[in-house]
Amino acid sequence: MNTKFPITAKGFKKLEHELKHLKHVERKKISEDIAEAREHGDLSENAEYEAAREKQAFIEGRIKELEDMAARAEIIDISKLSGDNIKFGATVTLIDDDTEEKVTYIVVGEYEADITRKRVSIASPIAKALIGKSVGDFVEVTTPKGSKSYEVVEVEYKALEL
């Protein structure tokens, strides 16, 4: 998959930091763990060895995934974005039509998405429904919990805190 994907400059630095840590710290540590487990004898019945090999496979897979993401990243400086329409990087305040509660989301890339911090992936159902909308628009979002309707009450672009 060669498609570019958006990421903030801070998000890209975080991605690079994770990649560097995996390559230079975790990879070395797991090699040492495997060597130590080998010293315990018969590898066919060595649970420590098997666990270390599984962890190594996970780490190598994550390294490949992050390298691919880094190669495809389209770094976007949110502080230079503006406008009334919702796009990547927007901080969007909505009012739930049913409860009249305000909720704020930030539209980010897949690597930076974290619903506990109200950061939604640009590929998520809510972000897909919001893209291109502006203040005063109503959006219908279909989620696993059902359909929700919101009114867009504020759109702004500001730097993200990591």
Curated annotation (Swiss-Prot):
Does DNA-binding appear among the keywords?
yes
- What GO MF annotations does this protein's record show? DNA binding; RNA polymerase binding
What Gene3D superfamilies has UniProt attached to this entry? Answer: Transcription elongation factor, GreA/GreB, C-terminal domain, Transcription elongation factor, GreA/GreB, N-terminal domain
Q: Which domain of life is it from?
A: Bacteria
UniProt-listed SUPFAM superfamilies: FKBP-like, GreA transcript cleavage protein, N-terminal domain
Annotated InterPro entries: GreA/GreB_C_sf, TF_GreA/GreB_CS, Tscrpt_elong_fac_GreA, Tscrpt_elong_fac_GreA/B, Tscrpt_elong_fac_GreA/B_C, Tscrpt_elong_fac_GreA/B_fam, Tscrpt_elong_fac_GreA/B_N, Tscrpt_elong_fac_GreA/B_N_sf
Q: Provide the alphabetized UniProt keywords.
A: Coiled coil, DNA-binding, Transcription, Transcription regulation
What does the record list as GO biological process?
Answer: DNA-templated transcription elongation; regulation of DNA-templated transcription elongation
Can you tell me which residues the record assigns to a coiled coil? 45-75
* PROSITE patterns xrefs: GREAB_1 (PS00829), GREAB_2 (PS00830)
Q: Which PANTHER family match?
A: TRANSCRIPTION ELONGATION FACTOR GREA (PTHR30437:SF4)
Q: What does this protein do?
A: Necessary for efficient RNA polymerase transcription elongation past template-encoded arresting sites. The arresting sites in DNA have the property of trapping a certain fraction of elongating RNA polymerases that pass through, resulting in locked ternary complexes. Cleavage of the nascent transcript by cleavage factors such as GreA or GreB allows the resumption of elongation from the new 3'terminus. GreA releases sequences of 2 to 3 nucleotides.
In the record, the note on similarity to other proteins reads: Belongs to the GreA/GreB family.
Q: What is this protein called?
A: Transcription elongation factor GreA
Q: Which organism was this protein described from? A: Rickettsia canadensis (strain McKiel)
